[in-house]
Design a protein with these regions (language model features):
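Short secondary-structure boundary/capping segments
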Residues: 40, 87-89, 115
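Short, charge- and proline-biased low-complexity linear segments
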Residues: 55-58, 62, 130-140
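Low-complexity, flexible helical/coil segments
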Residues: 77-78, 83-88, 124-125, 132-140
Length: 140
């Protein structure tokens, strides 16, 4: 029984470490999305893709390299009331998802769904799918 409990404890420590690593990965995205393309390149796998739309415009569909180029050419997309909150992280082995809620980015509010994978021992974002959930309301 002692060996079994010790194994479960090691698995829990590993899961906690993985959750912290994915949270840090999403923080790289948050920090990079306002113009720091080096952080975005660090966060995303080179073959990552993105899909989403703002209103009826499928503005963000394609290779992540296109998004990173756009951010480099158009820094400062986070508005004055920008907030980002990691709502959930769910991991199983070397795969998982993270959900990020953002307000006041490009004047809109978003929920981002990131597929993540541990590749060669390093967590990377492999896909971003987002939903625009409304226009940012100015503070009253």
């Amino acid at each position: 029984i002692h060996n079994l409990l010790q194994g479960e404890q090691q698995n829990m420590h590993s899961l906690i470490d993985d959750l912290a690593a994915v949270r840090a990965l999403i923080q790289l995205y948050i920090d990079g999305s306002n113009g720091d393309t080096a952080k975005l390149e660090q966060a995303f796998h080179g073959d990552a893709r993105m899909f989403g739309r703002i209103g009826d415009n499928p503005t963000g569909s394609g290779p992540i390299a296109d998004f990173i180029s756009y951010i480099g050419e158009n820094p400062g997309n986070a508005g004055p009331n920008y907030l980002a909150y990691v709502r959930t992280i769910d991991l199983s082995g070397d795969a998982g998802v993270a959900v990020l809620v953002e307000t006041d980015y490009l004047g809109h509010d978003f929920v981002d769904y990131f597929s993540v994978a541990r590749i060669d021992g390093v967590w990377k974002i492999t896909n971003k799918t987002y939903a625009e959930v409304g226009l940012t309301q100015p503070p009253s």
